[in-house]
A protein has these predicted regions:
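N-proximal low-complexity "stem/linker" segments adjacent to membrane-targeting elements
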Residues: 1-37
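A conserved acidic beta->alpha catalytic loop
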Residues: 22, 42-53, 70
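Glycine-rich, basic loop-to-helix element that forms the pyrophosphate-binding segment
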Residues: 67-85, 106
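Short aromatic/hydrophobic "clamp" motif used to bind/position activated sugar donors
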Residues: 90
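Conserved donor NDP-sugar-binding/catalytic core segment of glycosyltransferases
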Residues: 98-134
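Short, flexible, basic/aromatic active-site loop/helix in glycosyltransferases
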Residues: 139-181
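A short, conserved alpha-helix in the catalytic core of glycosyltransferases
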Residues: 173-233
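Active-site-adjacent helix/loop segment of glycosyltransferases
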Residues: 217-297
Length: 300
């Protein structure tokens, strides 16, 4: 099997419908057959209430569907499919994406010319065609504090001052050239099978957010290269798969950052546990309050 594609969905039925339509068109072009020989597609639905699973079963019988009885999270959902995936390469794909023609072939061919690459990510585009800044540096505790309190926004990209505050989101790079990176956004990642066999699957202790950061960190620690290439493009309806749970998303993000710090940076500094966790959760509730004041989330 050449390629296994995995999509984890939760209440994104119409986005998922468009995602699978674009994916099938791309896979037919890639394989030269409507039978989709040598590729497989998994959809893991995390107990959606919008009939996402029923839509997949009815409209896309070529997909291997798993309909969970409860929301097991992004990492666990991907791992469910990874346990059955047999491809030499695995594509992790968000349901709020649409493949731009030629992207999958470009990503697959990339590994031929970059033998040390374990992961390659495409350029993500907004619906208006503009480029999303989708790559990040690995988070440090101090760097994330700068980000969460808004210092990165106080010093605009390209300015000669405040560069340290912009490092996490790589704001001084336009995402228009090919380069090695720390962590591309998990909306679309092409992964080599040998990497999965070596470092394992996603850490299910991360329910939603930071699981791919942890996974990329482990990959680079094991000596693999992670690449971004603008020669492959994917349309990304940014944030649509998580915007419905803004409060939960913020809390999960801060808990994920704490788990990442504890797992990779804490060492024997046990005395920092309470400080780090309390500080991050306090910042989370400050962000939630700010969103409510701006009317971006409800008070419920």
């Amino acid at each position: 099997m050449l390629l296994s594609v995995i999509v984890v969905s939760w209440n994104t039925r119409e986005l998922l419908r468009a995602c699978l339509a674009s994916l099938r068109q791309e896979l037919v072009a890639l394989t030269g057959s409507e039978e989709l020989k040598d590729v497989e597609v998994f959809v893991v639905d995390n107990a959606s209430a919008d009939q996402s699973a029923e839509m997949v079963a009815d409209a896309h019988p070529w997909v291997k569907l798993t309909a969970n009885a409860d929301n097991r999270g992004f990492a666990a959902g991907n791992n469910q499919a990874l346990a059955h995936a047999t491809g030499q390469f695995v594509l992790l794909l968000n349901p709020d994406t649409e493949i731009v023609p030629g992207a999958l072939k470009t990503l697959l061919n990339f590994f031929d010319s970059h033998p040390k690459a374990g992961v390659v990510a495409p350029q993500l585009l907004n619906t208006d065609g503009s480029i999303q800044r989708s790559c990040r540096a690995f988070p440090t505790f101090l760097g994330m504090v700068f980000e969460l309190i808004g210092l990165s926004r106080m010093f605009p990209a390209g300015s000669s001052y405040g560069q340290k505050f912009r490092e996490y989101k790589m704001l001084d790079w336009n995402h228009d050239d090919e380069r090695q990176v720390d962590q591309p956004e998990g909306a679309c990642l092409m992964i080599k099978r040998q990497l999965l066999d070596e470092i394992g699957t996603l850490d299910e202790g991360f329910f939603m957010l930071f699981e791919e950061v942890d996974w990329c960190f482990r990959a680079k620690k094991a000596g693999w290269e992670i690449w971004f290439t603008p020669t492959a493009q994917v349309l990304h309806h940014y944030g649509q798969s998580i915007k419905q749970v803004k409060v939960r998303m913020i809390l999960s993000s801060h808990k994920g950052l704490y788990r990442f710090w504890h797992k990779h940076y804490r060492g024997n500094r046990w005395w920092l546990d309470g400080i780090a966790y309390s500080g991050l959760m306090a910042l989370a509730y400050v962000r939630i309050a700010a969103y409510r004041l701006r009317g971006l989330i409800s008070s419920s």
